[in-house]
Amino acid sequence: MLSAEEAPYQSCYCEENVYKLLEKLKPNLDDFFAVLISNDIKMIPLWKQKAERDPDVLWDYHVITISKNSDGSAKVYDFDSWIDWGVDFQTYWNQTMNEDEMKQFREKYRRKFRIIPARIYLSLLSSDRSHMLNPDGTYMKPPPEWPLIQNSTNSNLMNLIDMKLEFPETMVMDETEIRRFFSDA
């Protein structure tokens, strides 16, 4: 695995950061997943994120990488977290998803997760970065220097984070299901 410092990174472009990380890991992708996190209201509470000094942040979506080894152990790679790169899933879950603090949020804030095998993510994701444009056409945050990621369509990122939509070879899970999927056997 690359260190976080060795992996391509641009702040506020988590979907592309994960894509570029997985691209660098080819051909050894069998144990890796891109995990898109969002919900119906596009407001997901997460903790331990670098973007805020407050303990929590509300993102419209977030994308991370998780590896699931043959022994059942899982590690999380989140470019935007204060938690260690390659931390075990349970530690990441406890600190970032923070179920104790989540109790103060209404049900509509519950997160959903689209689990995409790495190879599928590399052939599926297309982003024209239009979601990062202001009304005047300028970028809200500086875009990455690498070219746009375009596969089968001009842009499907907003569809991928819509957890009601179905995509072949992807799985949408709730908080209980993802914990079960990535917890040690």
Curated annotation (Swiss-Prot):
| A Pfam family annotated for this UniProt entry | Nt_Gln_amidase
State its Enzyme Commission number(s).
3.5.1.122
Tell me the enzyme class.
Answer: hydrolase
- Keyword entries, A-Z: Hydrolase
Q: Which reaction does it catalyse?
A: N-terminal L-glutaminyl-[protein] + H2O = N-terminal L-glutamyl-[protein] + NH4(+)
Recorded hits in InterPro entries, A to Z, give: N_Gln_amidohydro_ab_roll_sf, NTAQ1, Prot_N_Gln_amidohydro_ab_roll
**One Gene Ontology term, aspect cellular component:** nucleus
Active site (record annotation): 14, 62, 78
GO MF term list: protein-N-terminal asparagine amidohydrolase activity; protein-N-terminal glutamine amidohydrolase activity
- Recorded family membership: Belongs to the NTAQ1 family.
Assembly state and interactors?
Answer: Monomer.
Q: Quote the function comment for this protein.
A: Mediates the side-chain deamidation of N-terminal glutamine residues to glutamate, an important step in N-end rule pathway of protein degradation. Conversion of the resulting N-terminal glutamine to glutamate renders the protein susceptible to arginylation, polyubiquitination and degradation as specified by the N-end rule. Does not act on substrates with internal or C-terminal glutamine and does not act on non-glutamine residues in any position.
Name of the molecule in the record = Protein N-terminal glutamine amidohydrolase
Origin organism lineage? Eukaryota, Metazoa, Ecdysozoa, Nematoda, Chromadorea
